[in-house]
């Protein structure tokens, strides 16, 4: 009985303390109280008596627990909020500091002494220049070409700052593309974007409208061809191959190979005519005097190992491989080179000679602009004719020769028949 009364008193006391302190009651403590350690302890009557000192301490603990600050309760307290409305926020308060926080200082929004409401001050930023390109002149194609140049410049310089080459003085000046484009009459002139280094301002110069349109059309054609090649077009691949072949022919047309074993008659007749035709067209070309072992002339500085001096390979067809044959070949090369120089001296051109006769000679020939064209083997009419016209004339001439040959053959047959008939009649 005493043990049961003791446990009941302890339970009542703990419930009372939890209610006063506003803390949840931990039921697990009952298990701790009923542990074996407390069972072994003896009965203590003093624990059942709650003296005056214990009551006073419990009262102090309960007052401290109820007086603990609650920030949500104080924040939403009606009396304090009404008092703040009457007095207004303090200047150095946290709310004012939070209101003024930002990139620009702001004044507290409220009534001033005069009674008018003040608005926060906003600093105005400097006004940016409005970029406007005007397309009032020129055709649609010219305007499209100018727009493509503007797009390229914008990719290099977003503010359209450029280096403009003055067409009169040729000086390079810093300018803006807006001013240059708007002041250009596309009916008379156009613009061209020059290649520049990475990080530099783009360079612009004035060109003719025709040249600007040609560059723009070439650019569009290249983009179209690239797209067709990526899609696997066979026609585009064939056109590309044809263009590459024509470019190779043009580059090969600027070279003229003359071998050391050429005869003097061919040099005076055939090669002289070919040189005259090229000079009449105003071409600048290069002549290579070399041995027949190489078909393509190598530029300077390349193939030094193959370009050995005159040796037995140059006279491999000779029967006697001795010094006499070597001297004969040297004299022959001297004679051919001197004959070529005499032919060039008779023509209205200038030339420069490089190399050695023991290996090969490189002769760069350029026509003289001021010199009067002399009457060389090809007539002046042949020089003015184009390549197609010359080809047609040659074809007509060959056709005439064939017709004449056919006529001669027919006459021979008829004569043979007449002679045969006359022979039979006589018999």
Swiss-Prot record:
**Region Disordered: which residues?**
71-125, 372-396
Spell out the InterPro entries in the cross-references: AIM23
Say if the entry is tagged with keyword Mitochondrion.
yes
Specify whether Metal-binding is a keyword of the entry: no
Q: Which GO terms describe its cellular component?
A: mitochondrion
* Main subcellular location of this protein, as a coarse class: mitochondrion
Recorded protein name is: Altered inheritance of mitochondria protein 23, mitochondrial
* Originating species: Scheffersomyces stipitis (strain ATCC 58785 / CBS 6054 / NBRC 10063 / NRRL Y-11545)
Q: Give the source lineage, highest ranks first.
A: Eukaryota, Fungi, Dikarya, Ascomycota, Saccharomycotina
């Amino acid at each position: 009985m005493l043990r049961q009364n003791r446990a009941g008193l302890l339970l009542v006391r703990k419930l009372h303390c939890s209610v006063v302190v506003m803390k949840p009651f931990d039921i697990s403590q009952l298990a701790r109280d009923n542990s074996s350690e407390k069972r072994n302890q003896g009965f203590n009557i003093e624990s059942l008596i709650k003296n005056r000192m214990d009551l006073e301490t419990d009262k102090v603990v309960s007052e401290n627990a109820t007086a603990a600050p609650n920030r949500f309760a104080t924040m939403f307290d009606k009396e304090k909020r009404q008092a703040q409305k009457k007095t207004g926020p303090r200047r150095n308060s946290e709310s004012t500091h939070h209101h003024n926080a930002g990139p620009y200082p702001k004044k507290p929004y409220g009534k001033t002494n005069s009674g008018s409401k003040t608005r926060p001050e906003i600093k105005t930023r400097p006004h940016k220049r409005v970029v406007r390109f005007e397309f009032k002149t020129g055709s649609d194609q010219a305007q499209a070409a100018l727009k493509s140049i503007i797009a390229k410049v914008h990719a290099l310089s977003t503010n359209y700052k450029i280096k403009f080459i003055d067409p009169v003085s040729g000086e390079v000046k810093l300018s803006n593309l807006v001013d240059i484009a708007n002041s250009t009459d596309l009916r008379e002139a156009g613009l061209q974007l020059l290649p520049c280094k990475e990080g530099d301002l783009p360079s612009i110069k004035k060109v003719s409208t025709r040249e600007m349109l040609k560059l723009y059309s070439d650019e569009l054609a290249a983009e179209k061809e690239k797209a067709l090649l990526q899609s696997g077009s066979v026609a585009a691949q064939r056109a590309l191959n044809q263009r590459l072949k024509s470019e190779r022919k043009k580059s090969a047309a600027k070279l003229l190979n003359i071998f050391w074993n050429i005869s003097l008659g061919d040099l005076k007749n055939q090669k002289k005519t070919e040189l005259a035709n090229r000079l009449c067209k105003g071409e600048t070309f290069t002549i290579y005097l070399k041995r027949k072992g190489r078909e393509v002339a190598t530029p300077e500085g390349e193939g030094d190992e193959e370009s050995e001096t005159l040796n037995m390979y140059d006279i491999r067809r000779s029967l006697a491989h001795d010094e006499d044959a070597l001297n004969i070949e040297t004299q022959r090369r001297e004679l051919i080179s001197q004959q070529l120089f005499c032919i060039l001296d008779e023509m209205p051109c200038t030339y420069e000679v490089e190399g050695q006769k023991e290996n090969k000679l490189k002769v760069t020939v350029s026509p003289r602009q001021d010199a009067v064209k002399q009457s060389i083997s090809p007539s002046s009419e042949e020089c003015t004719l184009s390549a197609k016209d010359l080809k047609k004339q040659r074809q007509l001439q060959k056709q005439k020769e064939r017709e004449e040959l056919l006529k001669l053959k027919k006459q021979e047959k008829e004569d043979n028949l007449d002679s045969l008939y006359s022979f039979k009649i006589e018999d």
